[in-house]
Amino acid sequence: MAVAQAEAVMRSIAEWDIRVPVELVTIPTIQDQYPELAKEVDGRAPYVWELEKALADGVIDLSVHSLKDMAAKRNPLLPVCAVSQREDPRDVLVLPSGVGRLLKGRPLGCSSVCRRYQLGKLFPGIQLKMVPGDVLSRLDRLDNGEFSGMVMSAADLKTLGLESRINRYFTAREMVPGCGQGFVAVQCRAGERVGYLANYHNANSWEISLAELAFSQTLGGGHSSPATAHAWIDGGQMTIRGYTVDRQGEKIPGMFSGPVKRAQKLGVELAAYLQAEANERG
């Protein structure tokens, strides 16, 4: 999927100016080779910091990621310099090929703690199992009979041309998407000129991502946290809705709205409010 995302960035650069030289560089990561050993680092997916090292060392000039994988701590020397228009942010249910319903006796798979938490509320009593690896490897395990179903990102499947595998879309109220889900982010080295990314960058996406990532950073989130938030813009106003979890595992929901120019502050304020509510519960 990373290659497909990078190729979309390359096409956008070529449309801006065909004379800008662009080369695709693929970098093998520990997540590609040993997905079961890959661990988050500061709230980032493991492949992110490996690509960031290549960027910092000058091996590459741009790095392309799913924004949801880099939603916690950020390196100011390697800023996000462009964010794509948002693809479908919803989570979806995928069943084994040729199967029309969840099969009894097999777990339902997912790849993040916030999905696992929300699925436990939607399907009480069902066995849930975390599944590492990329989209295709997870689908292989699903089709080989290891799982009754797999909950995945609609955006990831659509990027790979696998929309036909989707059996059910969860609304953003049923399953609040992960922070940054559906966005592709481009990283560069601080201070470098990246005007050639003007066609790729989406202003509304930038503001929404600021709100969601501010929420995640304030709560110390990432794939290892059950908390998440989803923001949207309507008529110059931004709304961000999310939740955290108290020590007893109960959901604490909240929603803030305000002018788009306050995007980052809205994310921080929602997170702070939810954290205060959780602290009051003890």
Where are these regions (language model features)?
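Short, Asp-centered acidic motifs that coordinate Mg2+ and/or phosphate
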Residues: 60-64, 148-149
